[in-house]
Swiss-Prot record:
Keywords: Ribonucleoprotein, Ribosomal protein. InterPro entries: Ribosomal_eL39, Ribosomal_eL39_CS, Ribosomal_eL39_dom_sf. Belongs to the eukaryotic ribosomal protein eL39 family. This is Large ribosomal subunit protein eL39. PANTHER family: LARGE RIBOSOMAL SUBUNIT PROTEIN EL39 (PTHR19970:SF0), RIBOSOMAL PROTEIN L39E (PTHR19970).
């Protein structure tokens, strides 16, 4: 990734950064909850973004 990024690329990277976090603990504590973890979690070295 270059140091000089276009704004569109930077905005996409910011969105992916926000998506790449674990689910909050209060979501797990909800009644009748089946979500255990974030299935769409991405590791920076294993899976690359298609930008």
């Amino acid at each position: 990734m270059s140091a000089h990024k276009t704004f569109i690329i930077k905005r996409k990277l910011a969105k992916k950064l926000k998506q790449n976090r674990p689910i909050p603990q209060w979501v797990r504590m909800r009644t009748g909850n089946t979500i255990r973890y974030n299935a769409k979690r991405r590791h920076w070295r294993r899976t690359k973004l298609k930008l």
